[in-house]
A protein has these predicted regions:
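Sec-dependent N-terminal signal peptides of Gram-positive bacterial secreted proteins and lipoproteins
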Residues: 4-22
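N-terminal non-catalytic accessory region
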Residues: 24-200, 204-258, 363, 373-484, ...
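Alpha/beta-hydrolase fold catalytic core
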Residues: 161-168, 172-175, 289-371, 396
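Alpha/beta-hydrolase-fold enzymes
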Residues: 250-320
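Structural beta-strand segments of beta-rich domains
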Residues: 493-497
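Asparagine-centered strand-capping/turn motif at beta-strand->loop junctions
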Residues: 499-504
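Short strand-edge motifs at loop-to-beta-strand transitions and within beta-strands
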Residues: 534-540
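Extracellular Ig-like/FN3 beta-sandwich strand-entry sites
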Residues: 547-551
């Protein structure tokens, strides 16, 4: 019964989330004359089986009316399955689901060697039929257009006639898809009459683009290439799924949803009170039953990160039956992937602008405890070295590569960008979720400037776009910075905290501010309304420690007129005010120490965590504690 209640609760929460509108990103400078090729995320293709598109069977590009029809046809069995599932029996419902999914995706099945069982075709592969202007004129839907929100904004600058939509047989490995991209770019050049293109890519498209640049970049067909949240080194979610070891992080999942819908209510702490572990059981029971249908897709194997690849092969593949698949994926993992830093650097040396935008600060939603954007680990997306999730490098940490004296350690000291594929051309955004680049004012504006102009050539080109940034998505509500300091840093001369309201619709009031490491007294007025997009300056008194290379956490508690009226956000700030802290080895916790931590004993802490109320109690206590100290009479 508890699991059934969880299902109902999660559905209600998801349905209650609302979308938020936002202003367009601002592109400054001369607009590029080259057409844009959009290389989308995973499975963004339409495949058919048969002699022609008109008479063939569509096997990807789902008809959701048909899906609903099948659900209704088996509604009784699904109802029984949910009933048994509520009592910890996932076999029945997953048998029902697998018996529908395997036939539905049968035509997509690959042999154990990675070749397609059926001869499938793409709808169109030429530039004319993939051109936005053509599609808008000849189709009433957006099925064949990729990343529609993004392309609509790009069209404001270059017109739909200069936007082209790439697609591939996404089941195949990155090397195969990169070959298709090369052929498509030749078609775009011929159709547009231009000698180069600009590339915008996302997720799997980022892996394909990086592979294309490694294998075909020598041709010089690209001017700007922007890879957002790219799966260059793989996707953590693929390993968790194929190995049936999903352990959903419910809080991260709900924050992902909040981020995507840009909701201004903070629902995720409710999920802490009622974990949704039933999803883990469902998926881990289902995946082995559908593995014969999707488990031999080369793209899924290229998604396995190199540190887990051999274990996955040994567990799931027969070395003889899957020899062909293994050969192709081995080549990606052990030849192409290691060459990408050198090949991308060569592209830059030859005049191309290559850039990566990646998210940090979240676990993988399916359970992998690594720093990520919720889907792809930061290390896989960028090549950076990351501390274990929930920890940071110890005080006095020294970056691995010197990078000509450039500082490559993140403000929270959990990311070392000196080992990145492109140390000077990669932007890291703490709190950015996968696929949400367009839904963050900072990343949206950055990606359009990188794509459509030649103004930004590296992370030092424009101080408005620092290499490390905290997300400004509306769901975060507030964003803090120290006046006169670089993003994420605090120096000795600082005397003012600037807090911005990142929400789009809600007025915010600052209820309290807590700092660990820094002993600061803020002149805070809790009755000042901060309008959406506006900021206030909060003076403070206190000394910044005369040290560098350590982190102070600043937690801003806020109040707003929403269903969840109180919330908070914690940001880590690197202190840069003197000699480096004495070097220590290993890692330390990244979690802030708050007043509540100092008064709650271990037994009470366990009880509150068990019932999911610790965060709520902590917020209320810390706000009261702040004002008790601020108003105390000596």
């Amino acid at each position: 019964m508890k699991k059934l209640l969880c299902i109902i609760m999660s559905a209600v929460m998801l349905l209650s989330l609302s979308c938020t509108a936002f202003a367009a990103g601002e592109v400054k400078g001369d607009i590029s004359e080259y057409p844009v090729v959009i290389v989308p995320g995973y499975s963004s293709s339409n495949l058919y089986y048969g002699d022609s598109l008109e008479t063939g069977e569509t096997v990807w590009g789902l008809n959701f009316d048909y899906v609903i029809e099948r659900v209704l046809a088996r509604i009784a069995e699904l109802g029984i399955g949910l009933g048994t599932f509520a009592f910890d029996d996932a076999e029945y419902i997953t048998d029902v689901l697998a018996s529908e999914m395997n036939p539905l995706f049968e035509k997509l099945r690959c042999n154990p060697d990675g070749t397609s069982v059926y001869e499938l075709h793409q709808d169109y592969t030429d530039a004319l039929h993939k051109n936005n202007a053509y599609l808008i004129e000849n189709r009433t839907d957006t099925m064949y257009r990729q990343e529609v929100e993004i392309s609509e904004e790009i069209a404001q600058y270059i017109g739909h006639e200069n936007i082209y939509n790439f697609s591939s047989d996404f089941r195949m490995g990155a090397e195969s898809c990169a070959g298709e991209l090369d052929a498509f770019i030749q078609s775009v050049k011929e159709h547009s009459g231009k000698d180069k293109v600009n590339i915008f890519s996302l997720s799997h498209g980022g892996q394909v683009t990086a592979t294309y640049l490694a294998l075909y970049g020598y041709k010089g067909d690209v001017d700007n290439a922007v890879m957002t949240v790219p799966a260059i080194g793989g996707a953590g979610i693929a390993y968790d799924a194929l190995m049936a070891c999903v352990e959903f992080d419910e809080e991260c999942l709900l924050r992902f949803v909040e981020n995507g819908t840009m909701t201004e209510e903070n629902y995720n702490w409710f999920v802490k009170a009622q974990p949704l572990g039933f999803v883990d059981t469902l998926l881990n029971t289902l995946f082995p039953k559908i593995f014969p249908t999707i488990g031999y897709w080369g793209s899924l194997w290229d998604f396995i990160t190199v540190d887990k690849y051999e274990h996955a092969k040994e567990t799931l593949l027969d070395s003889e039956e899957s020899a062909g698949l293994i050969e192709i994926s081995d080549r990606y993992h052990y030849e192409i992937l290691p060459s990408i830093p050198e090949k991308l650097a060569e592209c830059i040396d030859n005049g191309m602008n290559i850039s990566i935008i990646a998210g940090t600060g979240n676990v993988v939603v399916t359970g992998m405890q690594e720093n990520s954007d919720g889907i792809i680990t930061t290390a896989a997306a960028t090549g950076a070295t990351c501390a274990p999730f929930g920890q940071r490098f110890a005080d006095g940490y020294e970056q691995i590569n010197p990078c000509n004296g450039k500082d490559k350690v993140s403000p929270a000291m959990d990311v070392d960008a000196s080992t990145a594929y492109l140390p000077d051309n990669t932007w890291f955004v703490d709190g950015l979720f996968h696929g949400m680049t367009y839904k963050d004012n900072y990343t949206r504006t950055l990606m359009f400037n990188l794509l459509l102009t030649d103004n930004i050539t590296d992370v030092y080109s424009d101080p408005a776009y620092p290499q490390f940034k905290y997300s400004t998505n509306a769901s975060h509500t507030v964003h803090a910075s120290f006046k006169g300091c670089d993003e994420g840093f605090v120096t000795g001369g600082a005397d003012t905290l600037v807090v911005m309201n990142t929400s789009a619709n809600s007025t915010v009031r600052i209820a309290a501010i807590d700092c660990d490491v820094l002993d600061l007294d803020f002149a805070l007025n809790p009755f000042i309304d901060i309008a959406p997009g506006e900021s206030i300056e909060i003076p403070f008194k206190g000394e910044i420690p005369a040290v560098s290379g350590t982190v102070a956490n600043v937690t801003v508690y806020y109040a707003m007129d929403t269903v969840t009226p109180v919330g908070y956000r914690t940001q880590g700030f690197r202190i840069d005010n003197g000699e480096s802290a004495e070097k220590q080895d290993g890692f330390v916790s990244i979690e802030p120490t708050t007043p509540f931590d100092g008064v709650v004993d271990n037994n009470l802490n366990v009880i509150l965590k068990t019932f999911g109320f610790r965060e709520m109690f902590s917020m209320i206590f810390n706000i009261i504690y702040y004002w008790f100290n601020a108003l105390r009479i000596f």
